Amino acid sequence: MPRAYEIPFDSDRKLMTTVHKVNDNQYMVYTKGGVDELLARCSKYQINGEVRENLEEYKKKIDEFNDQMAENALRVLAMAYKQIDHMPSKEEMETIEKDLIYIGMVGMIDPPREEAKVAVAKCKSAGIKTVMITGDHKVTAVAIAKELGILEDGEDAITGSQLEAMSQEELVQRVENIRVYARVSPEHKVRIVKAWQAHGEIVAMTGDGVNDAPALKTADIGCAMGIVGTDVAKEAADVILTDDNFATVVSAVEEGRRIYDNIIKAIQFLLSSNVGEVIVLFFAILLTPFLATKFGIPIGLIEPLLPIHILWINLVTDSLPALALAFDPANKDVMKRKPVKASSGIFTKGMTWRIIYQGIMIGLLSLAAFVIGISTPNPPVIEGLTQEQVRVEIGQTMTFIVLAFSELIHVFNIRNNKESIFKTGIGGNKQLFWAIGASAMLMLVILAIPVLRAIFSIPVLPMDRIVETIELVIAPVVIVEIFKLLKINTSKDE
């Protein structure tokens, strides 16, 4: 039968109707949609080709069938029809979905994707609360939510009508325990998003239809479907999922956490290194009278680092590894941590503690290198320099080497603040490996080529001072490993 007219599906009505022409004097009206919504527009029902009255008496049986299907996670679609003798006018179209004859229902299985179950489980372990908002029957929604692991014992599922009866204040109070919303309207979605935001939560909302646009716009992160999503939904969203897969959202969260962690690593590395440099210079100035008296060196010569040393460390030693940390893979526990609160700053208690103690550690080790260097008893003879000047250059060289190489090795400490470097290893980031290798190689070039040694005022070190320098370079790894072992490298909230 040719289709003469169509009333498209509407999320408020939850119905769709088509009018078909049989002949000039006979038209058929077919309606399909939600069981409750359709039954409200039916006055009769049909069994085995026989149309019967008293639909009210039969509704109980229909509801039982509906619940049975819904409990099996089937999406139930009810159908009805009626016959009319003329093509309805536009005015009549508004009332055409009345006095229908109910003919039955069909249950359609729409199994959740396997990756969706895994994604929901990942969200749960990551401290992300997953909420289902659907137009399905409540029983169907509950069955699917339980299968996915969204709804657990003690958590609530409510309908749009129940939500309608709540004030926004009441919804805000209850929202943290509600995991499923069934038979909701577009306005309800906006209310749900705002209720979560009232608790200070960052809310991501997925949607594909025109009616999802307000909620997508209201959410902190609106995610529209790229395949089935409407243009209106895509315009309102911040992110478009090209594969329409919820698991992609979870993967994006994981990648976001990796990027955030790597930014933190780079900041911690740079600041702890800079604190180390400041400590060396500050205490050297503070101790200048003592060091001059103790080792018989003129006060004007007490200088642990030359300007060229500081420039080299800041521009070469620090910058390359800091940039390469951006490519670090995610830590194993990245999706087992609670989300960072929006109000939390980058400088948490744990990070501040690590920057301070690791900076002091690097600084004091470098200062120790300077003191050991200027205490050299029989320094080599260098033409044009006094013994005191040679001892100072040895101290400066040892400080320069310890500061530069200890910072390079310290990068591996920073990659994981909880697990031992011997457990995490030094692999997994080729860019970091090459960055550290390049920085180390450039340092060795300076130490090996006489012309560059002269520019950087670097003498050849006695063998005992070389051994002591290597020991001081390795020391940061040992100290941080002890801190990790004693669980004092992190704060309680990490």
Task: Show where each model-derived region lies.
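Active-site-proximal glycine-rich helix-loop-beta segment
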Residues: 212, 218-221, 237-238
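Residue-level signature of catalytic and energy-coupling elements of molecular machines
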Residues: 18, 34, 69, 79, ...
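C-terminal transmembrane module of polytopic membrane proteins
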Residues: 326, 401-494
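Short active-site oxyanion
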Residues: 25-29, 128-131, 178-180
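Cytosolic catalytic regions of ATP/NTP-dependent phosphoryl-transfer enzymes
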Residues: 1-102, 108, 121, 134-146, ...
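Short, acidic loop-to-helix structural element flanking the phosphoryl-transfer center
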Residues: 109-128
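Membrane-embedded transport module
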Residues: 152-205, 224-418
